[in-house]
């Protein structure tokens, strides 16, 4: 079996292994190894936990609901505690062509996913006995045309202390400022600790084996740039990490919500699960803030709730852009995504951008492709001599190996010359695979005709079938030294195997492979013409 076909088999096995491995990781992430401490019975970390002396009571009556809106999202805030209970992403449809905004945060009987925040500690206003009931005039607040930011303050007064919970919306940004301004006129110093947490129903990661997706927690700390912490991890071992910088998040396919506390103070990152109600929380607890009598203090934090936009997230917090997880192929995926985005900005079609990127990749690899076919042609010419050596030294494998290496050297043939282009294309393919799984820019991105979502599988399986046909043609047009009938049958079956395997892959990825095959066929014919002139190839079968 020639090297090219052998590596096609290896490529299929390798891709299958990577997909299965990632699916297993998403279903069963590795056990947490970073140093953690248990949350004790005396802790007042805010969550619905029996061991929590200052836990937030979930049974409290909801307050008034107000709406905040800028040009990219619409938020609903509960004035009881000031939690974000809904976020509608105005630039993203819930389903393809549905015209209904995608709702990321939501609170229903079937599913809870909300962003809670408050003040706990010695003089906290969010305790088991009750939460702050904020006051505000009006129900709807919208960023006006020409405005770059909008501040919406909620007011609460208690024991001579005025608390303002201020939400800051910015134009074109999914980054919501959540600040506290505290005016202490009580006559004595007070101490509070800020917290923010994401409360989510415990669910399993979704998707299929070909396109697995992760739903669960993640965090960043001063010791760990980025780490997933699944709901099963939370159920097995509650997280508790002290860090000066960092953030906590809940991830799902293409979207993320993340609390980013003040990065200049010490924070505790934690998780708490409520198995009875099937919910889990991942959050942070800030350092104690002391406000002397007659003084004011401002406590800052921010909440990202929106799509995984790498460039924007990188400016919000260190390592937040790592939630776009390209796996081990990130060093290839990032420049490929940049190139895709650049070309899409010119052609205004992601499908055309994929075709252009494929052309660029094949052009870069052309010298290696030419060397591959030249090496294969020389190897075919050497087949009679190699067969003669097998007959002469069949019992002396060491001598036969030495003679063959000598023959390769004399004829200036690299026996592995046919492998390199395929080996280089494999990580490129894997990088594109993760790009299509992770890049929200490709979600619901149309091509032409029946392909209206390049991030989803072809609904009619036309592209996988065309890809299989192109692979079959490429195989038939490539001379092979395979003489064993069994091996030949296996190779003839490979296009069908690949076609079946690609039925569930993103259509954009199948488009890449199809165009790559077509370009390879064209390059092959061009190379063969040159080889014919050198007497290294004949079109006669």
Curated annotation (Swiss-Prot):
Domain of life: Bacteria
Main localization category: membrane
Disulfide links within the chain: none
GO cellular component, one term: plasma membrane
Subcellular location: Cell inner membrane
InterPro entries: Membr_insert_YidC (IPR019998), Membr_insert_YidC_N (IPR028053), YidC/ALB3/OXA1/COX18 (IPR001708), YidC/Oxa/ALB_C (IPR028055), YidC_ALB_C (IPR047196), YidC_periplasmic_sf (IPR038221)
GO molecular function: membrane insertase activity
Gene3D superfamilies: 2.70.98.90
Protein's membrane topology: Multi-pass membrane protein
Region (Disordered): 34-56
Keyword annotations: Cell inner membrane, Cell membrane, Chaperone, Membrane, Protein transport, Transmembrane, Transmembrane helix, Transport
Gene Ontology BP annotations: protein insertion into membrane; protein transport
Keyword field contains Cytoplasm: no
Statement: the UniProt record of this protein carries the keyword Membrane: yes
Parts of the chain that traverse the membrane: 6-26, 337-357, 416-436, 454-474, 495-515
Pfam family, one: 60KD_IMP
Family indicated by similarity: Belongs to the OXA1/ALB3/YidC family. Type 1 subfamily.
UniProt function note: Required for the insertion and/or proper folding and/or complex formation of integral membrane proteins into the membrane. Involved in integration of membrane proteins that insert both dependently and independently of the Sec translocase complex, as well as at least some lipoproteins. Aids folding of multispanning membrane proteins.
Family matches, as NCBIfam families: PRK01318.1-1, PRK01318.1-3, PRK01318.1-4, yidC_nterm, yidC_oxa1_cterm
Quaternary structure, from the entry: Interacts with the Sec translocase complex via SecD. Specifically interacts with transmembrane segments of nascent integral membrane proteins during membrane integration.
Identification of the protein by name: Membrane protein insertase YidC
Originating species: Haemophilus influenzae (strain ATCC 51907 / DSM 11121 / KW20 / Rd)
């Amino acid at each position: 079996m020639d090297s090219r076909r052998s590596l096609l088999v290896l490529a299929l096995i390798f891709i299958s292994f990577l997909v299965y491995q990632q699916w297993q990781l998403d279903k069963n992430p590795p056990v947490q190894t970073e140093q953690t401490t248990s949350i004790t019975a005396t802790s007042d970390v805010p969550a619905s936990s029996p061991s929590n002396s200052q836990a937030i009571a979930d049974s409290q009556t909801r307050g008034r609901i107000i709406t905040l809106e800028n040009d990219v999202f619409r938020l609903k805030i509960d004035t009881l505690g000031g939690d974000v209970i809904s976020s509608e992403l105005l630039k993203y449809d819930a389903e393809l062509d549905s015209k209904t905004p995608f709702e990321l945060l939501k609170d229903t009987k079937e599913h809870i996913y909300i962003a809670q925040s408050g003040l706990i500690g010695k003089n906290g206003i969010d305790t088991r006995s009750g939460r702050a009931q904020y006051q505000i005039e009006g129900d709807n607040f919208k960023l006006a045309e020409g405005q770059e930011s909008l501040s919406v303050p909620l007011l609460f007064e208690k024991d001579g202390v005025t608390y303002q919970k201020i939400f800051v919306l910015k134009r074109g940004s999914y980054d919501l400022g959540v600040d506290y301004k505290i005016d202490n006129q009580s006559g004595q110093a007070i101490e509070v600790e800020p917290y923010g947490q994401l409360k989510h129903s415990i669910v399993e990661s979704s998707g299929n084996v070909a396109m697995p997706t992760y739903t669960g927690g993640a965090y960043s700390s001063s010791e760990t740039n980025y780490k997933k912490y699944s709901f099963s991890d939370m159920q097995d071992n509650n997280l508790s990490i002290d860090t000066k910088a960092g953030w906590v998040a809940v991830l799902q396919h293409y979207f993320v919500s993340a609390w980013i506390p003040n990065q200049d103070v010490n924070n505790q990152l934690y998780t708490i699960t409520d198995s009875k109600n099937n919910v889990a929380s991942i959050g942070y607890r800030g350092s104690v803030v002391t406000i002397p009598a007659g003084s004011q203090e401002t406590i800052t934090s921010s909440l990202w709730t929106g799509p995984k936009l790498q460039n924007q997230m990188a400016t919000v917090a260190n390592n937040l852009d790592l939630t776009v997880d390209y796996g081990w192929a990130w060093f290839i995926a990032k420049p490929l995504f940049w190139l895709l985005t650049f070309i899409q900005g010119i052609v205004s079609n992601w499908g055309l951008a994929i075709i252009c990127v494929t052309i660029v990749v094949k052009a870069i690899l052309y010298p290696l492709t030419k060397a591959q076919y030249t090496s294969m042609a020389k190897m075919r010419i050497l087949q009679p001599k190699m067969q003669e050596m097998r007959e002469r030294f069949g019992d002396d494998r060491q001598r036969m190996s030495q003679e063959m290496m000598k023959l390769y050297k004399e004829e200036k043939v690299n026996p592995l010359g046919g492998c390199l282009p395929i080996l280089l294309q494999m990580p490129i393919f894997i990088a594109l695979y993760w790009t299509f799984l992770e890049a929200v820019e490709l979600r619901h991105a149309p091509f032409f005709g029946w392909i209206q979502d390049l991030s989803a599988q072809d609904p009619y399986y036309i592209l996988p079938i065309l890809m299989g046909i192109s692979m079959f043609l490429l195989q038939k047009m490539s001379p092979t030294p395979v003489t064993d009938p069994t091996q030949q049958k296996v190779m003839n079956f490979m296009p069908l195997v690949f076609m079946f395997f690609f039925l569930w892959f993103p259509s954009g990825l199948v488009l890449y492979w199809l165009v790559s095959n077509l370009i390879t066929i064209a390059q092959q014919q061009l190379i063969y013409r040159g080889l014919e002139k050198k007497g290294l190839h004949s079109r006669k079968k």
